[in-house]
Each structure stands twice: as structure tokens, then as C-alpha cells.
């Protein structure tokens, strides 16, 4: 029997300017998904371990995109509960040289808090 690792947490939509541009220097944002526990599940799946991710996500297209992102790395998403209205968002501006990175969180009224 294969052992499985189960992670539980919040996956968030990350919006970031391309490269090392600042928010006000760019009119496009790159969208990806991340979060501590989701990142662990993906890393374990990349090492060939059975990893399961548990969370709550809305039933709309952004929630499904988060599920699809996890599945694309081989993470088992069958225990994700669907419901609520919001996915957490964070905006990340990568630092360059002496300028540090900037991270702004928008986590109000998340689906996960009602699990």
C-alpha cells in the first residue's frame, strides 16, 4: 500500500508583473496559483509521492483553474470542497537589486473560512 501525504490549507491566486517590473510600470499581470500547503503538495507529487490537497474553493472558473493547476502536477484534488464566493489573491512585485519584493494580500471573505 502506498502512503499518501495530505495537506490542508489555502491556495491563492498570485498576480505579478512580468520580470522585475513594478506594479505601476506594467499593464499586464501574470496569473499563477500558490500557497504554502499547495506548494508542498505539488513538490511531493513532483518527487513521485501520492499527495492529496484539501481545501474549499468556489465553484466558478477561477476556483476550477486552481483545481486544474494542482491536477496538472499530479496532486489528488478529489477532497476539495466546492462552495463560497472568493479565492484569496496576492499581488507580488519581485524585488530587484536593492529594492525588496512587495506582497499585497486580499483575503477577505474567503471560501476556506466557511469550511
Segments from the language model and where they lie:
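Beta-strand->loop->alpha-helix junctions that form or flank phosphate-binding loops
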Residues: 58, 78-87
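Short beta-strand scaffold segments in enzyme catalytic cores
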Residues: 89-93
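Conserved small/polar residues in nucleotide/adenosyl-binding loops
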Residues: 113-115
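Glycine-rich phosphate/adenosyl-contacting loop at the front of the ribokinase-like
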Residues: 1-75, 98, 102, 106
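Short strand-connecting beta-turns/loops that link adjacent beta-strands
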Residues: 85, 96-97
Amino acid at each position: 500500500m502506498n502512503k499518501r501525504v495530505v495537506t490542508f490549507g489555502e491556495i491563492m491566486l498570485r498576480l505579478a508583473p512580468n520580470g522585475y517590473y513594478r506594479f505601476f510600470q506594467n499593464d499586464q499581470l501574470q496569473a499563477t496559483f500558490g500557497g504554502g500547503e499547495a506548494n508542498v503538495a505539488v513538490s511531493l507529487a513532483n518527487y513521485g509521492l501520492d499527495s492529496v490537497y484539501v481545501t474549499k474553493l468556489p465553484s466558478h472558473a477561477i476556483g476550477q483553474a486552481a483545481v486544474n493547476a494542482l491536477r496538472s502536477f499530479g496532486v489528488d484534488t478529489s477532497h476539495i470542497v466546492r462552495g463560497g464566493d472568493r479565492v484569496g489573491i496576492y499581488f507580488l512585485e519581485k524585488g530587484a537589486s536593492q529594492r525588496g519584493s512587495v506582497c499585497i494580500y486580499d483575503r477577505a471573505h474567503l471560501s476556506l473560512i466557511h469550511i
